């Protein structure tokens, strides 16, 4: 996005009357947590609809290597600290919205057989910044009242508050 001339999001909202910045930022927070959860489970198929072919293939190849090496990447204390919609542009018949996510995780890899720490830290927090390009065909309108998939605690089913520690309070 560095070389793109981005238009303000207010202009995009005028093109799509159902577009809601707050709803999109919430969806992006949820998607980030889902992506980390899928990565740790070594099954990224649930997030396939949200990825380009190239990005999905890259992640899948990395996961296959982890499986072959007998390693699991653990991602804990996930928090999306902020989501900023930076702007939008049109490229090749698509609307491209640019979002920046500021996140925090604890990230480490263990050997599946021995439990030995391979890389990372079980305690040290990593602060990460991601820039995501969200792409859809120019002219596509936001569907009103489309339900959003949320993240729930795998143990008790309670909804996980994305902007908190992503640890179940129940």
Residue ranges and their predicted role:
Residues 2-76, 165, 169-170:
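Core segments of small alpha/beta cavity-forming domains
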Residues 41, 90-95, 125-128, 147-148, ...:
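Short flexible coil/turn linkers enriched for glycine and charged/polar residues
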Residues 69-113:
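Surface-exposed, charged secondary-structure patches
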Residues 83-85, 130-134:
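Hydrophobic/aromatic beta-strand elements that line small-molecule binding cavities or substrate pockets
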Residues 112-122:
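Mixed-charge, low-complexity intrinsically disordered segments
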Residues 142-151:
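Cys/His-rich Zn2+-binding cysteine-cluster or related metal-binding knuckle/ribbon modules and their
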Residues 153-156, 168:
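Short cysteine-rich clusters marking metal-coordination/redox-active sites
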Residues 157-164:
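Cys/His-rich microdomains that often coordinate metals
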């Amino acid at each position: 996005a560095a070389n793109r001339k981005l238009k303000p999001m207010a202009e995009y909202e005028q093109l799509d009357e159902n577009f809601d910045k707050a709803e999109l930022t919430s969806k992006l927070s949820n998607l980030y947590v889902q992506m980390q959860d899928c990565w740790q489970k070594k099954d990224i198929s649930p997030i396939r609809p949200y990825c380009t072919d190239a990005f999905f293939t890259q992640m899948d190849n990395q996961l296959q290597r982890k499986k072959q090496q007998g390693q699991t990447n653990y991602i804990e204390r996930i928090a999306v600290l902020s989501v900023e919609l930076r702007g939008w542009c049109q490229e090749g018949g698509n609307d491209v919205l640019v979002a920046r996510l500021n996140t925090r995780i604890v990230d480490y890899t263990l050997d599946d057989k021995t439990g030995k720490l391979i890389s990372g830290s079980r305690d040290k927090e990593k602060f990460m910044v991601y820039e995501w390009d969200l792409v859809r065909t120019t002219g596509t309108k936001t569907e009103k009242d489309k339900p959003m998939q949320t993240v729930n605690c795998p143990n008790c089913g309670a909804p996980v508050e994305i902007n908190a520690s992503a640890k179940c309070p129940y």
